[in-house]
C-alpha cells in the first residue's frame, strides 16, 4: 500500500530501536540488571539480523545498505551502555562488603548517578584525571626516534651480552684472554658513549638553530608587536611547532599539492582533517586533546554537584514530578554562534520537500472541542472525551496557534529563576564560551597550517571535521549540564508524554487526509512511526552536526509519509487523473511533529535542542537545518504546554 511506503522500509531497525529504548527505560528507572539483559538482547538481535543479511547476499560486490550502518552504530552504543551497566552492577555487588550503614542514606546512594544517558555513555562519568590519561595515551604510545645516547646505550648492552657469552666459554686458566676481553669491552663502550655524546651535542645545536629559524618564520607570519596577549603568544608558539613538525614529515607538502590541484574538492578537506587529527603527535591534535581535558575538568565538578544536590523521584531519571517554572530563560530563541570563523556556506541543492523551504511559519491548530474525538484514523472506537481535550479546554481563550501557545507559556514562567538555577546557568554560559573559544583556536590554527583552506566552504567543512572528534567525548557530560538546567522543562514534557502517549493523531489537529486510510496496528506501528524511530536515533549521536542531520531526516520522513497518506486518500475516485495535492503545508507540519515528539518518549530532546541551538553556527541556522530545529523546538514547546494545561486543571 502507498500509505505504508514511509513505514515499512526499516523493520529490523525499528525492532532494534524498540529493544534499545526498552533497555534505556529500564536503566533510567534504576533497574540496571534488567537493562543489562535488554542491552545484550539488542546486540544479539542486531548481530543476528546483519549475519542473515550477509549470508543471503549473493553478489560479492553488493553495497551495504544505509540501514546496516545505523544498526551497527546502534549496536556499538548498546555495547558501550552494557559495559557501563556491567561496571555499575559490579559496584552494586561490592556494596554488601562495606560495613553496614543506617537504612536512611541508602536511597541517596542509589540515585547518585548523573541524569545523562545519551550518546552511548552512561554515568557516573570518569574523573578528569582518568579522562586525561585516556586522552594522552595515544600520544605516549606513538613511536619516538631514539637519541644518539639511547642508541649508544643499546649498542653497549649488546656488546656486554656478547662479552658475557664469550667469558662463559673461556676456561679458568685463560686469565690473559679474559683481561683482554674486559679491556676491549670497556674501550668499545667508552668510544660509543663519546661518539654518541658528540653527535647529540651536534644534533641539539642544529635543532636549536632550526627552532630559532622557525621561530623567526613564525614571527614574520604574525604581526610583530611589542606586547602580545597570552593567546597570541601561544598561537605563535603552536605555529612554530607545526613548522618544526613539517620539517620531519612530508605528508603536509603532499596534501598541499593535492589541495592546489583541486581547490574546490571538499572531500579532500575531509580526508586531510581526518588524517591530521588521527596523528597524536601533530600539534593540532595535541591542542585538541588539551582543550578537551580543560573543558572536561571544568564540567565534571559542576555536573557532579548538580547530580548530588538534586532530589530525584524513583524511576524518573532525576526529574522532579512537578514543574513550577517550565522554561529556562532565553531557551527558545535561536542565537548566533560565537564562533569567529563561522562563514555562510553556499546553499547546496536539497531533495527535501517544499515544506522545508522559507521562513519558519506560525501554523494554527484546529480547535479541539469537548465532544467525542475522531478515532477512526488511529483505529480505536469513539468514546469519552480524551484527557488531551480536557487539558486544552482549560487553557485561556487565545488564538490557537503554536506561536501564541509559546508566548503564553513564556508569560506564565516565573520572572525570577530559582536560586539553584542561577549558578547552573552561569556555569553553562561560561562552559559554552570556553567551548566556542576552543573550537575557534583549533580552526584558526588549522587555517594557519593550510592557508588554502581559508575559504567559506572549506572553513565550514573544517569546522564540521573538528567538531566531531572534539564533542564526541564531551557531549554526554555537556548534555548532563543542559539537562540539569532544563530539568523542569523536561519534567513537563515527560509528563505530557505519559498522559497523552495514546492520544489519537486527530486530537492534535492532524487532518484525516494526512492519516492512513486503514488504521495501522496499535502494538507495533502507528502513523508516522518511521519518523519517530528516526528521531530516536538523535540521542545516539554525539556530534551536533550529525544530530542536526537526524532532525532534518525526521522532517523529511514526515513529509514523505504525509504525501503517501494524502495520495492514498485522493486515489479513491476511479478514473481521476488529476495529480494529488502538493506537499503538506506548514499548518500541518507542526501538529504532526508534535505527535511524533509525543510518541518518541524522549523528554531529553528539550536539552538536546537547547545545546544544538547554541553549537550550530549561522551557516546552518538560516538554512534548512535551522528551520527544522526551530520547528522541533516549537513542537516541544507545544507538548510542554499540554502538561501545563493538565496541571492547571
UniProtKB/Swiss-Prot annotation:
VPS9 domain residues: 487-648
PROSITE patterns with a match to the protein in the record: VPS9
GO molecular function term, any single one: guanyl-nucleotide exchange factor activity
BP terms from Gene Ontology: vesicle-mediated transport
Residue span of region Disordered: 348-393
Entry keywords, A to Z: Phosphoprotein
InterPro entries: MIT_dom_sf (IPR036181), VPS9 (IPR003123), Vps9-like (IPR045046), VPS9_dom_sf (IPR037191)
Phosphoserine carried by residues: 116
Protein name: VPS9 domain-containing protein 1
Organism: Mus musculus
Gene: Vps9d1
